[in-house]
Amino acid sequence: MEDQLSFFPGGLRVMPVDGDTKNTRTATKTLSTLHYSLVATHTTASAGLCTLSSDNMTDVQTVLCDVKKVVSSGFDFRRVVETEHHIPVIYLLSTTEPEQMVAGEDTEFLNHLLLKATYIVRKPLDQATMAQLWRVVAWRRCCLEERIPRDSMDDIAAHAGVVGKDGNDNDVIIIEEPQVHFKVVRSRGSRKRQLTINVDSGSSDGADANPRQKLEHKKDAKGPLGQHVASHLQPQEYCTKQQKDLDERRLLSLDSLFLKAILSTLNVSLCNPLILTVPAAFTPQDGMTMNKDKAPMIELPFGLPVDDFLVGQTAYGSAGPSIGAPDDNDDDAAMYAYTSALNNNAAVGSLMVPPIESTFTIIDPIVGTKGEGSVPVVVVSEDQNNAVAAIEATAPNNAELFMMPEQVAVDAPVDVEEGIMFSLESLLGLDEDMIPMEDAGGEATDDSLNIKEGGMEIGWDLDLDYILMNNTNEFAFLDDMAWIE
C-alpha cells in the first residue's frame, strides 16, 4: 500500500469504457475496495476519446476498455490514447476465444489489438489481479514519459522563437510530435480500417527509398553480404549494357553508292529503262540527263551491259582506260568494284537479268525513226525483193515506164501491219544494184554512188535537180520528158 501511494498519492484514477451495465457495476465495487477512484464511465470508445481530448478533462491515470468496443469503433483506441495523452490503456476480455466475440474481417482486427495490447484483464474482474494493476500502470507511464519527456517538450516550446545572432535560426531544433491518422471506410456493410502512422518521417533518405540504391549500397560492404549482392547485380548490369549497345548500333546508310546501284535493278519493269545512279563526279555526256541538286542519271536500255556504255569514262568524266582495267586511283578502283558487279556478262552472281531476246528476226521489215518529224526508214528483206522482181517481170510494158503511182504523203503515219512497204527502186522498176539506197540516217556519202561492176567503175552523178514533181505527185526525169515531147 505504501508503494502504491508513493506512485499515486491520491489513489489510481481509472476511467472504464464498457457497454455492459452489470459488468460496470461489478467493476466499480471491486475498484472501490482497492482504493481506486472512478473518474467517468463511457459506453463507446469514441465517447471516451472525446472526454480525454476535452479541455476540462480531469487527470486520468489509466483506462479500462472492453476490447469489443474498440473493434466496433474501427480504430486502435489504445495507440491513440497512449501516443497523444500518454495514458496507459488496459483491455478487458470477456472470453478466451476471439472467434466467439466477432466474425469476419473483425477477427483479424481483434487479433491485431490483442497482439499489441499493453495489458489484458479477463472479466469479471479478479480482486487479486486488480490489486497489482497499479504496478502495470506505473511502469507503462514511465515508458511513455521516457520516450517523449514532458520537460524536453516544454524547453523546445520555450525556445521556439529564439533566433541566432547572425539572423538565422540554424541553432533552433524543432521536434515534431508523432502524429497518428486513422481512416474508417464502410464497404458492403463491413468496416475496413486503415492505420497510417508517421512517427519518424525524416529518418528515411533518398537512398533507402530506392531498392536498387539499397543493393548498390550493400554491394560496397565487405564480407559475404557484399559478394552476394555483387553476384546478384552483375547479370542485371550485363543485360542493361547489352541493350544499350544494341540501341546505339548505327544502321547502314541508305546513301551508299552500292545500295543505290543495286536497288535500281530490283523489280524493274520490262518496258522501263534501267536507271543507274552514278556519283556527282561524272560530267554530263551523251546519253546522260542532268537534274539540279541531284546526281546525274544515266538511262540505259534494259539488258544493255553497263561496260559497253561506260567504256572510256573515268570518275571525272574524261577519257581514260576502260572500267574493266582501273588504274592506281582509289576512286576509279572503288567505282570499278560497283560497276563490274552490274556488268551483264552472264556470270554467276550477276545482278542484272540476261538480255531479252529480240521479238523479231532480221528478215522481217523494221521501221526505225530518229528524232521528231523525221521520215521513216524502211528496210526490206531479200525475200520481198525477189517477190517484187517476179511481179515486175510479168507486168505489161506501158508508155510511162518510168512513172510511179501516187505516193502517200510524207508526213502520214506508217502502219506496218496494214500493208507491205516497198523500196523506191522496186516501184521505179530499177534493179537494186543500179541506185544504192540511202542509209538509216538519211544522209548519203560521196562514196556510196560509186559501184564496181565487171571490174569497171560506173560513175553516177544523180542530183535531185534532175527530178521534178508534177501536179500528179509523180516523179519524171528531164531526159524522158524531152524524148516524149
Curated annotation (Swiss-Prot):
Presence of the UniProt keyword Transmembrane helix in the record: no
SUPFAM superfamilies: CheY-like
GO biological process, one term: phosphorelay signal transduction system
List of residues that carry 4-aspartylphosphate: 66
Entry PTM: Two-component system major event consists of a His-to-Asp phosphorelay between a sensor histidine kinase (HK) and a response regulator (RR). In plants, the His-to-Asp phosphorelay involves an additional intermediate named Histidine-containing phosphotransfer protein (HPt). This multistep phosphorelay consists of a His-Asp-His-Asp sequential transfer of a phosphate group between first a His and an Asp of the HK protein, followed by the transfer to a conserved His of the HPt protein and finally the transfer to an Asp in the receiver domain of the RR protein.
Region feature (Disordered): 195-236
Domain (Response regulatory) ranges: 13-138
InterPro entries found in the cross-reference section: ARR-like, CheY-like_superfamily, Sig_transdc_resp-reg_receiver
Basic and acidic residues composition bias: residue spans: 211-222
Biased amino acid composition, Polar residues: 195-204
Keywords, sorted A to Z: Activator, Cytokinin signaling pathway, Phosphoprotein, Two-component regulatory system
Family: Belongs to the ARR family. Type-B subfamily.
Job description of the protein: Functions as a response regulator involved in His-to-Asp phosphorelay signal transduction system. Phosphorylation of the Asp residue in the receiver domain activates the ability of the protein to promote the transcription of target genes. May directly activate some type-A response regulators in response to cytokinins.
UniProt-recorded name of the protein: Two-component response regulator ORR31
Organism: Oryza sativa subsp. japonica (Rice)
Lineage, broadest ranks: Eukaryota, Viridiplantae, Streptophyta, Embryophyta, Tracheophyta
Chain's gene name: RR31
